[in-house]
């Protein structure tokens, strides 16, 4: 058995879970999320109201889908109750971010400003010109937008300039020495 897959997903009060075959819909105070589970995996509710994920056999593919499906369902429940937030920092002279409505405008040393539009369900918050956060209920969307923004100006291993996650340690390299 998968150590993660066999654990039931607790459903807190105020969260409504609707299971229709392979489709799962979770509704909470922050919104609604839906997920379609892969075919051999089955999802049901137990006596305490928790969500239980089961697999038909111990085939390799089914074992891997078992833990994955359970974690994705747990992410849905967490998303509609607490939501997800990623905090990011900008390092570098002249590098900054400004909120333009619901979008972000970056000055990253290019000859033009870079505009990032907020997709549906994602909100941006700028704390200082070098610190901002990305929030939403869908963990995958929040992580993907964060990765896309980081990709605009990856942290430089020599000087440490660029966009990074808050608390991320950049592996620094020593520059070449002159004679």
Curated annotation (Swiss-Prot):
InterPro entries: Ribosomal_uL6-like (IPR000702), Ribosomal_uL6-like_a/b-dom_sf (IPR036789), Ribosomal_uL6_a/b-dom (IPR020040), Ribosomal_uL6_bac-type (IPR019906), Ribosomal_uL6_CS (IPR002358)
A cellular component term, taken from the record's GO annotations: cytosolic large ribosomal subunit
UniProt xrefs under Pfam families: Ribosomal_L6 (PF00347)
Keyword annotations from UniProtKB, A to Z: Ribonucleoprotein, Ribosomal protein, RNA-binding, rRNA-binding
GO molecular function terms listed in the Swiss-Prot or TrEMBL record: rRNA binding; structural constituent of ribosome
Gene3D superfamilies (alphabetical): Ribosomal protein L6, alpha-beta domain (3.90.930.12)
GO biological process, any: cytoplasmic translation
Family: Belongs to the universal ribosomal protein uL6 family.
Role description: This protein binds to the 23S rRNA, and is important in its secondary structure. It is located near the subunit interface in the base of the L7/L12 stalk, and near the tRNA binding site of the peptidyltransferase center.
Self-association state and partner proteins as the record states: Part of the 50S ribosomal subunit.
Official protein name in the record: Large ribosomal subunit protein uL6
The organism of origin for this protein: Mycobacteroides abscessus (strain ATCC 19977 / DSM 44196 / CCUG 20993 / CIP 104536 / JCM 13569 / NCTC 13031 / TMC 1543 / L948) (Mycobacterium abscessus)
Organism placement in taxonomy: Bacteria, Bacillati, Actinomycetota, Actinomycetes, Mycobacteriales
């Amino acid at each position: 058995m998968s150590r993660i897959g066999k654990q039931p997903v607790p459903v807190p009060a105020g969260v409504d879970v609707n299971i229709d075959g392979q489709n799962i819909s979770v509704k909470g105070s922050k919104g609604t999320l839906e997920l379609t589970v892969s075919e051999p995996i089955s999802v049901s509710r137990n006596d305490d109201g928790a969500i239980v994920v089961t697999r038909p056999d111990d085939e390799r593919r089914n074992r891997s889908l078992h833990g994955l499906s359970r974690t994705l369902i747990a992410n849905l429940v967490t998303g509609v109750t607490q939501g997800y937030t990623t905090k990011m920092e900008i390092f570098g002279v002249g590098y900054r971010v400004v909120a333009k409505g619901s979008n972000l405008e970056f000055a990253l040393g290019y000859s033009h400003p870079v505009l990032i539009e907020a997709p549906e369900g994602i909100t941006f918050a700028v704390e200082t010109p070098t610190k901002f956060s990305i929030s939403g209920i869908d963990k995958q969307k929040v992580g993907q937008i964060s990765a896309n923004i980081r990709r605009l100006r990856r942290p430089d291993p020599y000087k440490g300039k660029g966009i990074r996650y808050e608390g991320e340690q950049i592996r620094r390299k020593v520059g070449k020495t002159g004679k």
